[in-house]
From Swiss-Prot:
Residues 118-128 have a biased composition (Low complexity). It is found in: Nucleus; Cell projection, Pseudopodium. Belongs to the myozenin family. Keywords: Cell projection, Nucleus, Phosphoprotein. The gene is MYOZ1. One of its GO terms (molecular function) is FATZ binding. It comes from the Eukaryota. The modification Phosphoserine is found at residue 82. GO terms for cellular component: actin cytoskeleton; nucleus; pseudopodium; Z disc. This is Myozenin-1. Myozenins may serve as intracellular binding proteins involved in linking Z-disk proteins such as alpha-actinin, gamma-filamin, TCAP/telethonin, LDB3/ZASP and localizing calcineurin signaling to the sarcomere. Plays an important role in the modulation of calcineurin signaling. May play a role in myofibrillogenesis. Residues 136-162 have a biased composition (Gly residues).
Length: 297
């Protein structure tokens, strides 16, 4: 007799053919693009800092802006065109040339006896960009690139300089641009030149003669009554009462009984009643018949 109600559905067995196709297809599809695998932690950090989606990247960007603002506000004369003449003493003597628009200087030194053109420039805040140019050939010559200092060529507007082509440069050598964008505020205030800095030894811990401070009268730490002390003494109407002090009498020394047995005990431990030390006699009648039976029984 069949049971009443809806019969349970038959459980279908999952086919393993589909699983085999998926596992086998992964080996054949070698052209699948899974993206770039970043294995260097530095790339990951730079990518996260450039997204500006989390709090850390925003704080990093604000810190960069604060640093640039601090450098520009504390040394505004360094980045102005009118003050670039002061940097002439920092330029090397070999092939040096100052650029005013790009705010940098360039020099070149070659091993083949010649000097090749070298240029460089700094950005808005004096970024130390270095441009290398390898010169090859024979002969000697000297010159400056069309973008020297960022003023003589197309590299002047964007803050980048250019160098001479290979066919115009003579000798072989490595050209490096050096930027002097930091000036110590101590050296700037004292007017010390680089030559004097080597010869002169400055001891910043040596203190000079201390100037004598003016002797001002301080009213903050003095408790002065209203009107001064003279008026305050006249307004004083309270007088201390006069009383006769009797002779000083020494208090009698009280000796307490140090017998520990007579001292009361305030311990919380339940202690039974103790005797006072006197012998206690109990009269017990021991005239009991030895028989177990008496006359009453």
């Amino acid at each position: 007799m069949p049971l009443s109600g809806t019969p349970a559905p038959n459980k279908k067995r999952k086919s393993s053919k589909l699983i085999m196709e998926l596992t086998g297809g992964g080996q054949e599809s070698s052209g699948l693009n899974l993206g770039k695998k970043i294995s260097v932690p530095r790339d990951v950090m730079l990518e996260e800092l450039s997204l500006l989606t989390n709090r850390g990247s925003k704080m990093f960007k604000l810190r960069q802006l604060r640093v640039e603002k601090f450098i520009y506000e504390n040394h505004p004369d360094v980045f102005s065109d009118s003050s670039m003449d002061r940097f002439q003493k920092f330029i090397p003597t070999v092939g040096g040339q100052l650029g005013t628009a790009g705010q940098g200087f360039s020099y070149s030194k070659s091993s083949g006896g010649g000097q090749a053109g070298r240029s460089g420039s700094a950005g808005q805040y004096g970024s130390d960009q270095q441009h290398h140019h390898q010169g090859s050939g024979s002969g000697s010559g000297s010159g400056s690139g069309p973008g020297s200092g960022g003023a003589g060529g197309p590299g002047g507007h964007s803050g980048r300089g250019g160098a001479l082509p290979d066919n115009q440069a003579g000798g072989e050598g490595k050209h490096i641009t050096v930027f002097k964008t930091y000036i110590s505020p101590w050296e700037k205030a004292m007017g010390i030149d680089p030559q004097q800095k080597v010869e002169l030894g400055i001891d910043l811990l040596a203190y000079g003669a201390k100037a004598e401070l003016p002797k001002y009268k301080s009213f903050n730490r003095t408790a002065m009554p209203y009107g001064g002390y003279e008026k305050a003494s006249k307004r004083m109407t309270f007088q201390m009462p006069k009383f006769d002090l009797g002779p000083l009498l020494s208090e009698p020394l009280v000796l307490y009984n140090q017998n520990l047995s007579n001292r009361p005990s305030f311990n919380r431990t339940p202690i039974p009643w103790l005797s006072s030390g006197e012998p206690v006699d109990y009269n017990v009648d021991i005239s009991i018949p030895l028989d177990g039976e008496t006359e009453e029984l």
